[in-house]
Amino acid sequence: LAGCADQEAPAVVDESVSVVEVDFETQLQLQLLEAKPGDVIDIPAGTYALYRGLSLSVDGVTIRGAGMDKTILSFKEQVSGAEGLLVTANDFTIEDLAIEDAKGDALKINESKNVIIRRVRTEWTNGPDTANGAYGIYPVQTENTLIDEVVAIGASDAGIYVGQSKNVVVRNSRAEYNVAGIEIENTFDADVFDNVAINNTGGILVFNMPNLSQEGARTRIFRNL
């Protein structure tokens, strides 16, 4: 038929490929800055390249992905920021996502109360390296913190590090190929159980460092591998 040769064939869409908007990073940081207590920030499945560290300082926010192997925040080309994600807020939950290849610490939570870190993976994908960030999951000076079903791989210091905190549970988690798998430092009332800490220089460490804001006590460690 006349004119048929000029028509373009319909595009073939590969549904297995995630299409990520170019301005995702700007949108996500804006959501974090403008969040209100009670907000849930949902991040769909996909691998998202981020170039600057993220931060949250609003209480009562949940960040939720589609799964630790489905929603991936990749900081491989990070050019600014000391962490992948820095949180200085109370009543915070993060779950079902991964933070990869952060320039510094992957997930740092500082001076926060009532924190849940669940089904989060932190990883440096190039394998063990002294140039990797120091800490994977890093709550410091927190109170009432649950770390559950997380995975921490490849930190140049500790995969899961809890410092100067009170009332902490670390359970059902896996730490591999870090210098220290799980480290509890200067912390009161921590329970560490049902975890796997293998292929690290040290598996699970508990100690007090001098000249810090508090000395720790009453850490219980049981049923770990």
Tell me what each language-model feature is.
Residues 2-3:
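C-terminal motif of bacterial Sec signal peptides marking the signal peptidase cleavage site
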Residues 6:
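Short, conserved catalytic or interaction motifs in soluble domains
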Residues 9-26, 60-103:
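Right-handed parallel beta-helix/beta-spiral solenoid domain characteristic of secreted/periplasmic
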Residues 19-23, 31-50, 62-66:
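Glycine-rich repeat segments that build the extracellular carbohydrate-interaction surface of secreted
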Residues 26-33, 118-119, 194:
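Solvent-exposed, polar/charged alpha-helical surfaces in well-ordered, non-transmembrane soluble domains
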Residues 28, 50-51, 77-85, 101-108, ...:
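Extracellular beta-strand/beta-solenoid scaffold signature
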Residues 38, 64-70, 91-101, 113-126, ...:
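Right-handed parallel beta-helix
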Residues 54:
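Phosphate/pyrophosphate-binding loops and the adjoining catalytic core of nucleotide-dependent enzymes
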